[in-house]
Curated annotation (Swiss-Prot):
Domain ShKT per the UniProt entry, residue ranges: 45-80
Signal sequence segment: 1-20
GO cellular component terms given for this protein: extracellular region; nematocyst
Protein name listed in UniProt: U-actitoxin-Avd9b
Family indicated by similarity: Belongs to the sea anemone type 1 potassium channel toxin family. Type 1b subfamily.
GO molecular function: potassium channel regulator activity; toxin activity
Highest taxon in the source lineage: Eukaryota
Organism field: Anemonia viridis
Main location: secreted
Transmembrane segments: none
Cited function: Inhibits voltage-gated potassium channels (Kv1/KCNA).
Length: 80
């Protein structure tokens, strides 16, 4: 009986140590993920608008100020 209790205790201790070592964010760092970090990790990395329109928007700095262009010109705005 004591051997079973000891085995359960050891397994619980291992679980606690492994869980405590995990980092707090998806990227593995100690800082919180920002919205920009989440946008960079998107799986659909393409421009919904024409390439010329997205390039023009990037030049006019709309990529930094407009969520509309950040979503629709991900590749040209460098968000992925």
């Amino acid at each position: 009986m004591n051997l079973k209790v000891l085995a359960v205790f050891v397994l619980c201790a291992i679980l606690v140590v492994v869980t405590a070592e995990r980092r707090g964010t998806e990227t593995g760092g100690y800082k919180k993920d920002t919205l920009q970090d989440l946008k960079k990790r998107t799986h659909d990395c393409f421009d919904r608008y024409r390439e010329a329109a997205c390039t023009s928007d990037n030049i006019r700095l709309l990529c930094k100020t407009s969520a509309k262009y950040q979503i629709n010109c991900k590749k040209s705005c460098g968000l992925c």
